[in-house]
Design a protein with these regions (language model features):
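Divalent-cation
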Residues: 11-226
Length: 226
């Protein structure tokens, strides 16, 4: 599927100077449909929207002039940690939880730096980062974890969302953000107009939503793909 949707590319910005209620309303208006498709609980919704925004920023901006691929896993922390292992000394270990919330602007810049390292980020339902640099165990004999044309990061995202209650958000080096829940690809977020003519969409029976005010296009799985 390609670039015949007439999407206008407008920079995606949710200003940090906004009043919190206004900012939350804008995030929900932009990504609420993704949360609904992922069957996200109310208590996890705000966290998921914040993480998706961070993922879109990474997809759009990259880091130090190059594209970045990474993975965020939200919720069911105990099971996620049990089904993953550290690839390196955890750069988030030992920091107080109040400085590790995804909504903190200074932390978001730190996370963007750490995203250049291998491994996944793990957050709890409240939006606190609990670990970074995690290698997610993937059952290589489960074909449902693999999508032709997508790599091991997306297999890990599908697998961990299938075997735990977590929702996973994968950022590809081609600048597309994909959201997985219950082992299924629930949405793709395309942050730039030119990508629509280059990227194949993998979301089953997608509903395409244009959000020109946010500068993104959403491909959200249809009900029959639930």
């Amino acid at each position: 599927m390609g670039g015949a949707y007439g999407i206008r590319a407008i920079p995606f910005v949710v200003a940090r100077s906004m009043a919190n209620d206004e900012r939350r309303a804008l995030l929900d208006a932009t990504f609420g449909v993704v949360c609904e498709s992922a069957r996200c609980s109310d208590e996890r919704r705000e966290t998921l929207e914040e993480v998706i925004q961070l993922a879109v920023e990474l997809a759009r901006e990259g880091r130090e002039g190059r594209k970045i691929g990474t993975l965020f896993v939200v919720g069911d922390v105990d099971n996620v940690l049990e089904q993953s292992r550290s690839l390196l000394l955890d750069p988030l270990y030992g920091h107080p939880s109040d400085v590790l919330h995804v909504g903190r602007p200074e932390l978001r810049e730190t996370i963007k730096e750490f995203a250049q390292l291998d491994g996944a980020f793990v957050l709890d339902d409240n939006g606190t980062f609990v670990s970074a640099g995690r290698f997610v165990d993937v059952d290589v004999n489960a074909p449902e974890n693999f999508f032709p044309g997508l790599g091991t990061r997306h297999a890990a995202a599908a697998s961990i969302s299938r075997t735990t209650g977590a929702i996973s958000i994968a950022v590809s080096q081609s600048s597309v953000v994909r959201v997985f829940a219950a082992g299924k690809l629930r949405a793709e977020i395309i942050p730039e107009l030119f990508l629509l003519s280059k990227e194949r969409l993998f979301t089953p029976t997608p509903e395409i939503r244009e959000l020109p005010e946010a500068g993104v296009t959403l491909a959200v799985a249809g009900d029959e793909a639930a």
